[in-house]
Amino acid sequence: MVATYVTLEDPVKAVVDLINNNWDGTYTSAVGGTKPTIDESWDLGKRNLKNGDIIRCYEISGGHDILGIGKGLDKHTSTITIDIATAVSRSRLRALYQGVIHIIHAAHSKSAGSALNSDYASIKLLSRTDQSDKLRRWYRYVLNCEITSYEVVN
């Protein structure tokens, strides 16, 4: 018997779509009236922060855990990094961060305007690192979040 598996959407694309689809006028006005560039890291290439704020997403790890004996569930988790950067100010960085956090919390509680892609069961925040460089006026937070899907193993 051949096992069949569902093709899941790329977890990075799912996180980018979640943030992009829920970034509305409230967040845009909180960060000075300009929506940041939100995309997958490999699609953005090099960008100058002086031209606008950037939110890059990329996957740093993934894993599978078979739940049960024999036929069961494959719990797939991916750790996605959300890299938030601005050259404006620390308060602008905090506003961008608050927007991203609010969207992820809303998705986790299933109250986001646009839901997390249906391939994935949940998204949760893991950590935040401040990687700002005050000498260069480059303000940056790096967030890690975990996105989880479940798949039946035949």
Feature locations, PLM:
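Short, conserved charged micro-motifs
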Residues: 89-95
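Small/polar-rich, solvent-exposed N-terminal microdomains that initiate assembly or binding
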Residues: 1-70, 107-113
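Conserved acidic
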Residues: 7, 11, 92, 137
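"Short basic amphipathic alpha-helical interaction patches in structured regions
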Residues: 71-73, 95-101
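Acidic-leaning, charged glycine-interspersed low-complexity segments
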Residues: 101-154
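Oligomerization/assembly interface segments of phage tail-like spikes and tubes
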Residues: 72-89, 139-150
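A broad, low-specificity signal marking well-ordered, structured residues that form hydrophobic/aromatic
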Residues: 53-56, 80, 123, 143
